[in-house]
């Protein structure tokens, strides 16, 4: 333990020394930086093109370009003294040109407000320049980025747009159906996905119906989905990252949106908190509020009488979110927010689930007037609890987690689109979990944990090369363990249109699922810390016996691939990945004995609550994307293979889908592009399951060893299972269609009608089979829907 502590101290000292030298070096240049805002709302504009050039020069070689980040921030870190012209462009806004003088201050901070164009000739969902520039100057391995416009061009479920649509069509992502609402990314489980909202971890982002998340699409500013090889700024999970950012409320005027459909009713309100005396100063504040509640309890029996044998659709959920933001003229901002989410699903005589989550926090961006660093931070706390009863008479599974998080991130912007960032994060959580395994043995745990992590990330452009090394230190004092996580990304621009790329690294996490990865139905979604009571010995596939040092989950990622732009509008992305999981933890379904003194001679794998596993995943993801004016096409093919080793045998987990296809098409009709049609077709090869080999009468031996089993009449029927996950379910496929019509009204008000059909050809996709009664429950049937929204 002393060695690990000393090692951490030495690493931190070296890191601080390196940063001190770096800061001193960069502090000698003039810096021009600033923010670009929407003049009508005060919201930062991401992906705007900012160009600076000497005032007397028109030579393109003297131009320096930058792209604004998600908050509208840009920076030119090394500018010589003199007079310059700055041009700001975005395809939806009027161009702005301003002359400036550099040299009077070491740091010059600017502010631009752009007016929206009245008639945008070519809206493509993304800024083409910004997209092309980031392709050449950033590694961007295994990431898909979408804004609100991009999300709205995907087919909606139940006449409501939701980010679930984006997750479902992301390369490398597997969903096990319409119900359950969880996703599996390149061999990882739901517990191994880090999902954040403005820096706050969201423990369960999906509702049980599977069509809807806890996120409000109207509030989403950006969504970044990393399916592997993510850089050192992200940690705490070993499979994927889904980083979601909400916009602020309108700082200039009050407004909102109300919508209704058979699935839910929704309301969004926003406006200024106060009006500053000088409205052009850049100071101000805003609020935004959203609420949605499911209406299926009232609508399903009438509109969908054929669903669930006339019993309606047993889903009920509520989501509430509110945020207040204050901004300064220099670009600094602080936000405070709170949320509440709940979910309930009830299949009579089969299963019942309840969960709720609530919390709040604040985040800030600080732009120091005398420093070139951009500082961001967050602090938050939340509670998540869930209860699941699988069958009548069975004891419920109960899980709860309380968590807090405090983090700071620092960014330096260098020449040629290079950047250094570093940060520190402190988090803590306590978990409470109770369940029974298949032989009715109690599994119960309550833990308290603290995590401390720090990272350093460096991105540099060297000619045709983009190199992105990084390093993360994750300390788990309660275990105790110190994990060093190197990361590396690289890209080589062979030509303007063809790029090779690579990313890889080590990842760790302290969380373990409070449900087995072998469960066929995964409605239950609970959390545990890394188990401390795993078996003393673990047998690897090659027969080697090792002693696990801890119960953390670990992974190594290795990904390579290429990007090719056939034209400005048609692009191909191909990636080959391999993930090695040297250590995973899982609930021990083989537990037969309590872990007490009298069973000391029994092997650990038959009495411990959790077991250690290992495994791997590999595959190929292909994405073909076409975006031009009215037409948007998105085609994805994924091949994947996942295997786990539990110390005895190799087995495929329940999410091991070999082939997955997603085809999406969207077209805007009409002179005003006010009529929209979206289509999505999904195909998935069969998922593995454990077949039933037969049934037998079990004897409870209620009289102990003296029970005369020859004269008793066993009352219990037990199931004899076949080889684990040795069979495959039928293939899954589904077609969804959505049509939208928009009407522009007076005073910038707007009305929209959405008509959708989910599962157009009414495919019977199996969801669950009761082993005893053989009763089949199917995924959702054909579901036509119509919804209306009014924006004011």
Protein language model annotation of sequence segments:
Residues 37, 49-55, 89-93, 103, ...:
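Short, acidic, small-residue-rich periplasmic hinge/interaction motif at the N-terminus
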Residues 169-170, 214-255, 266-268, 277:
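A beta-strand signature from Gram-negative outer-membrane beta-barrel systems
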Residues 682-715, 728-736, 740-792:
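C-terminal beta-signal and adjacent terminal beta-strands/loops
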Residues 403-407, 447, 451-455, 547-551, ...:
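Outer membrane beta-barrel strand-and-loop segments of large Gram-negative receptors
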Residues 77, 153-155, 200-227, 312-314:
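Short acidic/polar hinge/loop motifs at secondary-structure boundaries
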Residues 31, 263-295, 306-344, 352-376, ...:
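Transmembrane beta-barrel wall of Gram-negative outer-membrane proteins
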Residues 155-201, 221:
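Extracytoplasmic beta-strand/coil segments of soluble accessory domains associated
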Residues 577-580, 599-688:
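Gram-negative outer-membrane beta-barrel transporters
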């Amino acid at each position: 333990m002393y060695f690990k502590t000393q090692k951490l101290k030495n690493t931190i000292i070296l890191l601080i020394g390196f940063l001190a030298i770096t800061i001193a070096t960069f502090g000698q240049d003039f810096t021009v930086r600033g923010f670009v805002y929407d003049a009508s709302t005060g919201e930062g504009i991401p992906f705007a093109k900012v160009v600076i050039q000497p005032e007397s020069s028109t030579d393109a070689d003297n131009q320096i370009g930058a792209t604004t980040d998600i908050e509208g921030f840009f920076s030119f870190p090394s500018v010589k003294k003199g007079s310059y012209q700055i041009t700001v462009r975005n395809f939806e806004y009027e161009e702005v040109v301003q002359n400036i003088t550099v040299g009077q201050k070491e740091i010059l901070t600017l502010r631009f407000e752009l007016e929206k164009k009245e008639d945008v000739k070519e809206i493509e969902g993304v800024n083409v320049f910004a997209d092309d520039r980031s392709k050449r100057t950033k590694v961007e391995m295994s990431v898909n980025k979408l804004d609100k416009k991009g999300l709205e061009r995907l087919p909606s479920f139940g006449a409501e747009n939701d980010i679930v649509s984006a997750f479902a069509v992301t390369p490398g992502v597997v969903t096990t159906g319409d119900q359950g609402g969880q996703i599996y990314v390149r061999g990882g489980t739901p517990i191994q996905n880090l999902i954040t909202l403005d820096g706050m971890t969201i423990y369960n982002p999906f509702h049980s119906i599977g069509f809807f998340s806890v996120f409000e699409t109207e509030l989403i500013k950006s969504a970044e989905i990393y399916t592997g090889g993510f850089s050192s700024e992200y940690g705490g999970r070993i499979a994927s990252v889904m980083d979601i950012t909400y916009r602020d409320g309108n700082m200039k005027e009050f407004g909102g949106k109300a919508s209704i459909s058979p699935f839910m009713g929704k309301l969004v309100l926003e406006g200024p908190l106060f009006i500053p005396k000088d409205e052009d100063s850049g100071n101000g504040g805003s609020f935004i509020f959203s609420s949605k509640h499911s209406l299926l309890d009232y609508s399903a029996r009438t509109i969908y009488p054929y669903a669930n044998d006339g019993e309606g659709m047993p889903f009920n959920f509520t989501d509430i979110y509110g945020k207040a933001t204050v901004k300064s003229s220099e670009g600094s901002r602080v936000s405070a927010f709170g949320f509440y989410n709940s979910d309930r699903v009830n299949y009579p005589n089969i299963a019942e689930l309840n969960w709720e989550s609530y919390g709040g926090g604040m985040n800030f961006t600080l732009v120091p007037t005398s420093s070139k660093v951009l500082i961001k931070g967050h602090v938050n706390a939340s509670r998540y609890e869930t209860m699941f009863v699988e069958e009548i008479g069975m004891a419920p599974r109960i899980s709860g987690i309380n968590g807090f998080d405090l983090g700071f991130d620092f960014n330096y912007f260098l020449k040629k689109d290079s950047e250094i960032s570093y940060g520190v994060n402190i988090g803590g959580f306590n978990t409470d979990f109770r369940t029974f395994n298949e032989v009715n043995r109690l599994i119960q745990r309550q833990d308290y944990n603290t995590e401390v992590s720090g990272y350093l990330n460096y991105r540099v452009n060297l000619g045709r090369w983009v190199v992105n090394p990084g390093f993360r230190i994750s300390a788990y004092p309660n275990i105790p363990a110190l994990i060093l996580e190197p990361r590396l990304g690289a890209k080589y621009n062979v030509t303007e249109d063809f790029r090779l790329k690579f990313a890889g690294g080590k990842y760790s996490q302290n969380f373990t699922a409070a449900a087995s990865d072998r469960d066929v139905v995964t409605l239950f979604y609970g959390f545990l810390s890394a188990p401390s009571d795993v078996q003393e010995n673990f047998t690897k596939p090659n027969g080697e016996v090792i002693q696990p040092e801890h119960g953390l989950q670990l992974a190594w990622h290795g990904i390579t691939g290429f990007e090719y732009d056939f034209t400005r509008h048609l692009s191909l992305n191909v990636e080959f990945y391999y993930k090695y999981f040297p250590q995973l933890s899982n609930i021990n379904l083989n537990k037969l004995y309590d872990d007490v003194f009298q069973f000391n001679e029994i092997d650990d794998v038959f009495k411990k609550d959790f077991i250690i596993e290992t495994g791997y995943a590999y595959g190929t993801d292909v994405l073909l994307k076409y975006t031009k004016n009215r037409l948007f096409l998105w085609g994805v093919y994924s091949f994947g293979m996942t295997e786990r080793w539990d110390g005895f045998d190799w087995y495929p987990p329940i999410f091991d889908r070999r082939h997955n296809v997603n085809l999406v098409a969207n077209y805007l009709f009409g002179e005003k592009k006010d009529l929209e049609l979206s289509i999505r077709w999904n195909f998935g090869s069969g998922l593995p399951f454990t077949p039933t080999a037969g049934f037998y009468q079990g004897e409870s031996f209620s009289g102990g060893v003296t029970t005369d089993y020859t004269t008793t009449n066993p009352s219990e029927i037990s199931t004899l299972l076949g080889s684990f996950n040795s069979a495959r379910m039928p293939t899954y496929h589904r077609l969804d269609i959505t049509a939208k019509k928009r009407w522009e009204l007076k005073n910038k008000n707007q009305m929209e009608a959405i008509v959708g059909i989910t599962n157009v050809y009414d495919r019977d996709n199996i969801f669950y089979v009761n082993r005893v009664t053989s009763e089949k429950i199917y995924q959702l049937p054909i579901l036509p829907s119509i919804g209306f929204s009014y924006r004011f």
